[in-house]
Amino acid sequence: MLPFLFFSTLFSSIFTEAQKQYWVCNSSDASISYTYCDKMQYPISINVNPCIELKRSKGLLHIFYIPRRDLKQLYFNLYITVNTMNLPKRKEVICRGSDDDYSFCRALKGETVNTTISFSFKGIKFSKGKYKCVVEAISGSPEEMLFCLEFVILHQPNSN
């Protein structure tokens, strides 16, 4: 009995359940999905229309989220990995508290954020490979993590 308890305790962290993967979209050259990287797994819905093509693509990013805190001060910590190379951490301030670019920056705790943001990759050339981006959303004073998502983009450019 003692060996069973010992080994089950020792190996319990090795045999953990896999994270549920949420599919965002597929395009002719990319596949995009995400998983939660925190234990909260606070519901968020992300949609891209049209799906990202990493060759001079533009489109709309749709986000549906009910924040657990006011979004007067919001920033993202971005941890990006290209294939196996880790890029330096990037802090992207989204909401400063005044003169903000996005309407959701004034959203209060519990209010629905249902927003659409345009994007463009014009002039950026992405190499073939696996891109990972961990996004930590931090808000408030004192700072608190709202959510953490790990995006995976598999880029397989067409040889045409």
UniProtKB/Swiss-Prot annotation:
Signal peptide (residue range): 1-18
Disulfide bonds: 25-51, 37-148, 95-105
Keyword terms, alphabetized: Disulfide bond, Glycoprotein, Immunity, Inflammatory response, Innate immunity, Secreted, Signal
Positions annotated with a glycan in the UniProt record: 26, 114
GO molecular function: coreceptor activity; lipopolysaccharide binding; lipopolysaccharide immune receptor activity; Toll-like receptor 4 binding
SMART domains in UniProt: ML
Keyword Signal: yes
Keyword Transferase annotated: no
Matches recorded under Gene3D superfamilies: 2.60.40.770
InterPro entries per record: Ig_E-set, LY96, ML_dom
Mod. after translation: N-glycosylated; high-mannose.
Gene Ontology biological process terms, A to Z: cell surface receptor signaling pathway; cellular defense response; cellular response to lipopolysaccharide; detection of lipopolysaccharide; inflammatory response; innate immune response; positive regulation of lipopolysaccharide-mediated signaling pathway; positive regulation of tumor necrosis factor production
Primary location recorded for the protein, binned into one broad class: secreted
Cellular-component GO terms for this entry: endosome membrane; extracellular region; lipopolysaccharide receptor complex; plasma membrane; receptor complex
Compartments reported by the entry: Secreted, Extracellular space; Secreted
Stretches for region Interaction with lipopolysaccharide: 119-123
Subunit structure: Heterogeneous homomer formed from homodimers; disulfide-linked. Belongs to the lipopolysaccharide (LPS) receptor, a multi-protein complex containing at least CD14, LY96 and TLR4. Binds to the extracellular domains of TLR2 and TLR4. Ligand binding induces interaction with TLR4 and oligomerization of the complex.
Function in brief: Binds bacterial lipopolysaccharide (LPS). Cooperates with TLR4 in the innate immune response to bacterial lipopolysaccharide (LPS), and with TLR2 in the response to cell wall components from Gram-positive and Gram-negative bacteria. Enhances TLR4-dependent activation of NF-kappa-B. Cells expressing both LY96 and TLR4, but not TLR4 alone, respond to LPS.
The protein, known as: Lymphocyte antigen 96
